[in-house]
């Protein structure tokens, strides 16, 4: 198989079709993103497996199904944001029909479709169909209910933090480690008939705010509601910034257009490496591996500012995006040298972020495992130094 580095983006061919709303049509032309198999590596025999992550390249908002690995037959609610690569996520979304409300609903599931830019699944016991597409700091869910004789609910669980229920709006935060918070602002295109806080398995409409473990807001929609679209923004700065991120990125509830835009972004990013010859399997392995390179680090600059857990402060980025959640022990050998060849600008910003981390921690030591919640100082040696040395040599 012959490799070619192509700095110019290739022509993009949309394969988003009418079948299922956003699934790929059969086409004679496949883009690099069509070879990506996010399920590859999802079963681990020793360490942590890979996860089928839905996100845009190096973007702050990442999700994957709430399950242990590919063999797990249940989902613990629906995801809203991953806050640590292969580590943890924040918040839970639980659409539900019935009278046994809980902060997180465990779902059996089937007919899952998962692309880097799109997710679809049937929650079969609940008879609910879910579609999802992300942007950089916001995302969109489409929830289709089908049981006509049961009430229609949506639960938003903060897990460990605070939540507020308004008229078609829910906002709040989840407390992470090292004085770090992730904030949420979520809107519905369907006005609920009532909102409140989950208490003892029921919706308390007289209560609009809650704090602590499993603080959970509830939206109750009119009987017979078939489809609810939810759009949300996330932030590590504030609830207000989460709202701004949503408004900047998602002007409407058009999931099809959002998924198509995500596909084009992925195809352009992966097209920096072109191949000739080889088998379909070879191309799957190559482009899936390249897709993994874009999982981390993530850019957490929001409108020119970012929260740094390395000193617990909000900083201006002065036009240079701030990246973290890298786990350098995993990435210094291949991911960083490759990124320098195919995306020199991003690699420069990543290395600049390391230097800012060292300054913010006050000891001028380069980070070893930079995460959203700061540097966890794992693994021996300091591989950021090797990363900088390699970049300087190139």
Report each predicted region and the residues it spans.
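C-terminal motif of bacterial Sec signal peptides marking the signal peptidase cleavage site
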Residues: 17-18
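Accessory carbohydrate-recognition regions in carbohydrate-active enzymes
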Residues: 24-394
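Bacterial N-terminal signal peptides that target proteins for export
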Residues: 1-8
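Repetitive helical segments and hydrophobic/amphipathic motifs
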Residues: 11-14
């Amino acid at each position: 198989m012959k490799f070619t580095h192509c700095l110019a983006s290739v022509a993009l061919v949309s394969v988003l079709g009418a079948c299922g709303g956003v699934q790929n049509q059969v086409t004679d032309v496949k883009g690099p993103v069509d070879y990506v198999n996010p399920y590859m590596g999802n079963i681990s025999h020793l360490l942590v497996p890979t996860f089928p992550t839905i996100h845009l390249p190096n973007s702050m908002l990442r999700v994957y199904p709430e399950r242990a690995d590919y063999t797990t037959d249940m989902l613990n609610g629906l995801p809203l944001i991953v806050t640590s690569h292969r580590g943890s996520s924040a918040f839970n979304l639980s659409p539900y029909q019935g009278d046994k409300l809980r902060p997180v609903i465990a779902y059996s599931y089937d007919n899952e479709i998962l692309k880097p830019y799109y997710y679809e699944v049937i929650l079969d016991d609940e008879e609910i169909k879910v579609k999802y597409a992300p942007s950089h700091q916001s995302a969109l869910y489409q929830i289709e209910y089908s049981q006509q004789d049961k009430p229609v609910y949506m639960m938003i669980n903060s897990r460990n933090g605070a939540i507020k229920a308004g008229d078609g709006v829910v906002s709040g935060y989840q407390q992470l480690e090292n004085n770090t918070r992730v904030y949420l602002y979520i809107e519905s295109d369907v006005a609920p008939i009532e909102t409140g806080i989950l208490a003892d398995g029921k919706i308390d409409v007289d209560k609009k705010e809650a704090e602590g473990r499993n603080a959970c807001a509830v939206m109750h929609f009119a009987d017979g509601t078939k489809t609810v679209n939810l759009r949300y923004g996330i932030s590590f700065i504030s609830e207000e910034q989460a709202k701004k991120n949503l408004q900047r990125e998602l002007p409407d509830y058009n999931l099809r257009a959002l998924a198509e835009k995500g596909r084009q972004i992925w195809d352009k990013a992966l097209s920096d490496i072109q191949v000739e010859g080889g088998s379909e399997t070879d191309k799957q392995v190559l482009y899936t591996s390249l897709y993994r390179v874009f999982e981390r680090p993530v850019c957490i600059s929001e409108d020119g500012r970012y929260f740094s857990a390395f000193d617990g402060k909000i900083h201006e980025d002065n036009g240079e995006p701030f990246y973290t959640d890298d786990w350098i022990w995993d990435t210094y050998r291949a991911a960083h040298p490759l990124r320098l060849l195919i995306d020199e600008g991003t690699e420069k910003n990543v290395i600049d972020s390391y230097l800012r981390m060292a300054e913010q921690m006050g000891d001028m030591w380069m980070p070893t495992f930079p995460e959203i919640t700061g540097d966890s100082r794992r693994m021996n040696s300091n591989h950021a130094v090797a990363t900088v040395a390699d970049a300087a040599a190139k």
